Amino acid sequence: FDCPILPMRYESAELCKISINMFLVSSVSTTNMLAEVCEAIGADWREIAPALRLDRRIGPHAYLTPGLGIGGGNLTRDLVSVQALASAHGTDAGIVDAWLSNSEHRRDWALRTLRAHGVERPGIVLGLWGLAYKEHTQFTKNSPAMALIAALPGVAVRAYDPAVADAETPGSVTRVASALAAARGADLLATMTPWPEFASVNAEEL
């Protein structure tokens, strides 16, 4: 492989991969928290992020895109592993507890917002854009969309995702063939996975 090779003991190698994910989680969690503060006070995170990238201690490739918590399986698995290691060896992993708590809070942002707009009123139809836990994947483990669907069992849901198989979708959800089809006839519409095609939909088409 044409990449740096860093000799290290087995224990260090195991913890190295976990450490990379921990730093990623810290960036994700900090971004999500600050984006929510922006929403509360009228600031715009999109204006702030470019300034952070100019700081060499943060860098141009930093993960600074707000989202709905920590999705997928790998990051959560490593967080739980660190919790177990800390518990077994008497070290403090309180920051990991905070990351997991923040992730759950952010995951439910869409649920809180939709409830504030009456999503559970009788007869409401909810359109969902995206079911995967992130764009460019078919996987739904720890997906905010799936958590949202589970939290709204009495709500009629029309969902579109370009990659997730129909078999992965709860039977109560109606799958449709396009983003516009999911929006058509919906009283409320939530973008749960930031697939690029959603950004290109013209608001006048909705």
Regions found by a protein language model. Name each.
Residues 1-206:
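Structural/interface elements that position substrates and couple domains in central-metabolism enzymes
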